[in-house]
Regions:
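Surface-exposed loop/turn motifs in large extracellular/passenger domains
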Residues: 1-3, 8-40, 44-328
């Protein structure tokens, strides 16, 4: 187990730190007394704010040995703070690979003494990943009370999940308690065969002016059952408006299960006082396995969730609820 810190404060801020990782020898995957392998890289680790921190990663992160523990993880955390802002943090990964599950955070929720602590803001953060392969799952996550003007870019990225691997899904999620506005997820030359593929920008009160762009991407499921879930939603909120989803050459492999594929620029979390308007899906090319069906492809959908299950449906044609949502 290794933890690397560019800057840390137990009672204050961690700002303007840089962590450069260019390993000459990758980290070894070993059978140890703990029964799992877990390593973490931190740009800024603090309690009252973490801003302007950068993590640069080049070369392979691990050896090619595969480990199978559900606790395995390689955590890349640009900013960790219990309160205050987590703004202008960056993660760059180039020409690298990992056989551990990779979790990348520009800002993250922290749990202490059964309490959740969120940064007050996660704004203007960036993740750029190029020429990278994860032989387990790959997840990029931003969590804060407010998240705006964040960008996540993939170019030539693979999330290769073997059917025998313990898999938690491959996801890109920007999640805010209040508002998530003006965020961009741009995916190019990407493939994932995780059981749970989720690409979401979401907030409770407002998700607006967000954009997801998908080019030359292959999504499927590695398991023998060919059962999984795929969700692509640019603005999931009680108030979702002016969000854009652009899809050019999306290839969908076999999904045998029902209620598996949901694609929309906007989604609302129920019908009570929710609104979805001025959202647009631009669709140029889909290539779909012959037995695969897209459950919902729409300008907006409704997401229902309780303690037992979750489901989705097309938003009803009610001008007070949904208007000017377009599928082009």
């Amino acid at each position: 187990l290794f933890n690397f810190y560019a800057g840390a404060s137990n009672n204050g801020e961690a700002n303007y730190n840089t962590l450069n990782i260019e390993l000459k020898h990758p980290l070894e995957i070993a059978n140890n007394f703990l029964g799992y392998n877990q390593h973490s890289f931190y740009g800024g680790f603090a309690t009252k704010g973490a801003n302007h921190n950068t993590i640069n990663i080049k070369n392979d992160l691990t050896t090619t040995d595969l480990s199978q523990s559900y606790k395995d993880a390689l955590n890349i955390v640009a900013a960790r703070t219990l309160e205050g802002s987590a703004d202008y943090n960056k993660v760059y990964i180039n020409n690298s690979m990992s056989t551990l599950p990779v979790y990348i955070y520009t800002a993250k929720k922290n749990i202490l003494n059964n309490q959740d602590f969120y940064p007050s803001s996660a704004n203007n953060n960036k993740v750029s990943i190029k020429d990278f392969a994860s032989f387990r799952n790959l997840t990029v996550l931003t969590e804060a009370k407010e998240a705006s003007y964040n960008t996540i870019n993939y170019n030539n990225v693979q999330s290769i999940t073997d059917a025998s691997n313990i898999d938690k899904g491959s996801k890109i999620i920007i999640r805010a308690l209040d508002k998530a506005n003006h965020n961009t997820i741009d995916i190019k030359n990407y493939s994932s065969n995780a059981a749970d593929n989720a690409y979401l920008i979401m907030a409770y009160n407002e998700a607006a002016y967000n954009k997801i762009i998908i080019n030359d991407t292959l999504l499927g499921v590695a398991s023998d059952k060919r059962e999984g879930i795929l969700s692509i939603i640019a603005g999931l909120s009680n108030n979702g408006h002016d969000n854009t989803l652009i899809i050019n050459n999306l290839n969908l492999d076999e999904y045998k299960n029902n209620n598996s594929i949901f694609i929309a620029p906007s989604a609302i979390t129920g019908l009570s006082e929710a609104k979805s308007y001025n959202n647009t899906l631009y669709r140029w090319e889909f290539n779909i396995f012959k037995n695969t069906f897209i459950d919902i492809l729409a300008g907006a959908l409704v997401h229902y969730e309780d303690n037992y299950s979750a489901s989705n449906a097309i938003t009803p044609s009610d001008i007070s609820l949904s208007k000017n949502n377009r599928l082009i």
